[in-house]
Design a protein with these regions (language model features):
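Hydrophobic face of amphipathic alpha-helices that form TPR/SEL1-like repeat modules
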Residues: 1-5, 32-41, 70-77, 104-113, ...
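Low-complexity/repetitive intrinsically disordered segments
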Residues: 2, 190-196
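Short coil/turn and helix-start
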Residues: 7-11, 25, 43-47, 61, ...
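Residue-level recognition of tetratricopeptide repeat
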Residues: 28, 64-66, 100, 136, ...
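Intrinsically disordered, low-complexity polyampholyte segments enriched for Lys and acidic residues
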Residues: 58, 77, 126-129, 141, ...
Length: 196
């Protein structure tokens, strides 16, 4: 990161990639993931989604949970691989089971929408809850939506408002809008146009 971010040295993308590549070739998980990110964004190398997927897969198979999420994203969007919700679901699940909150949120979405798996609201709520408990802001917002709409859980205005507020206070824009809507409508709180 020193050469990439210019920490203690002048920033040098080519030098950063040299060292990241050296770490990746030594089978260092974080190095493999970072090299995948370089290829994903064209950071110090020419952008190449197929190479990004290769290194995400190598890192994911070595146990790097963020690489599992990134590989799931590639399958979800069809970047560097043929689009496959089943593969996206599989990698999100592996990342979630390793404790990575972004994967928990994405896995919840798969269960909510039936992407790559049979729709299951209770499983969606379970994974949103786990992501929220880890401090993941989007998971908090998604969980609040479930409580607001009574999807996968019993409708509960207080819980919806609680999770919207926590997510909004953390900076999640969607949660800010949802919290404002609650104040506008008087949902779970006294109607307050100024607060909205």
């Amino acid at each position: 990161h020193a050469f990439h971010d210019g920490i203690g040295v002048e920033a040098d993308a080519a030098e950063a990639v040299y060292w990241v590549r050296a770490a990746a070739y030594q089978r260092y998980g974080e190095g493999m993931h970072r090299l995948g990110v370089c290829y994903e964004y064209g950071d110090g190398v020419e952008q190449n989604w197929e190479r990004a997927v290769h290194w995400f897969r190598e890192a994911a198979e070595s146990g790097v949970s963020v690489a599992m999420a990134d590989l799931g994203y590639c399958y979800e969007k069809g970047c560097g691989v043929e689009q496959s919700w089943e593969q996206a679901f599989s990698w999100y699940r592996r990342g979630a089971e390793c404790g990575y909150p972004v994967s928990m949120s994405n896995l919840g979405l798969c269960y909510k929408r039936g992407y790559g798996v049979e729709q299951n609201w209770q499983e969606a709520v379970k994974w949103y809850e786990q992501g929220a408990q880890c401090g993941h802001l989007q998971s908090m917002n998604n969980l609040a939506c479930c409580y607001e709409d009574g999807e996968g859980v019993e409708q509960n205005e207080e819980r919806a408002l609680y999770w919207y507020r926590r997510s909004a206070e953390g900076g999640n824009g969607s949660a800010m809008c949802n919290l404002g809507r609650c104040y506008k409508r008087g949902y779970g709180v006294e109607q307050n146009w100024q607060e909205a």
